[in-house]
Amino acid sequence: MAEERDAEGTEALIAELHKKIKDAFEVFDHESNNTVDVREIGTIIRSLGCCPTEGELHDFIAEIEEEEPTGYIRFEKFIPVMTRALVERRYRPAAEDILLRAFEVLDPAKRGFLTKDELVKYMTEEGEPFSQEEMEEMLSAAIDPESNTINYRDYITMMVVDEN
């Protein structure tokens, strides 16, 4: 009896995930032919609350991209892989305390902020570098226009995804 209830709950969860995935995919299916441009996949995945690295995104796309013609992703290939990623809670965003520690490493003087120039340097020259577009998007959300700095505690609070 309890097993039946669990199975029904799982089926309901999967159905709900499929609807969310379909809704997100359809936003980018401009031809209404169940395909999207491969360049939109990262946006779709992130709109579903996932935060893959560029490497993880590349692997995800390699698993589902059409062989001929390349550059497109079919919904039928996308939905099982995306469903599995959501069920397994892959590509979770970093926790607030981890983000704070990362910013504190970049701020050895413990000022509580980084200048715009410091932020741009770190985000475009270190680790997995941001693209120009990603950097502009981050700056528009993060930088205080009056001081030209980012108060990283405020920024982290604003950016952290609520898991509930």
UniProtKB/Swiss-Prot annotation:
GO molecular-function term, one example from the UniProt record: calcium ion binding
Disulfide-bonded cysteines: none
Any one annotated GO CC term: cytoskeleton
Keyword Repeat: yes
UniProt cross-references to PROSITE patterns, sorted A to Z: EF_HAND_2
Domain (EF-hand) ranges: 16-51, 94-129
Keyword Repeat attached: yes
Location within or outside the cell: Cytoplasm, Cytoskeleton, Flagellum axoneme
Alphabetical UniProt keywords: Cell projection, Cilium, Cytoplasm, Cytoskeleton, Flagellum, Repeat
Predominant place of localization: cytoplasm
Family: Belongs to the DRC8 family.
Complexes and interactors: Component of the nexin-dynein regulatory complex (N-DRC).
Functional summary from the UniProt entry: Component of the nexin-dynein regulatory complex (N-DRC), a key regulator of ciliary/flagellar motility which maintains the alignment and integrity of the distal axoneme and regulates microtubule sliding in motile axonemes.
Name of this chain's protein: Dynein regulatory complex protein 8
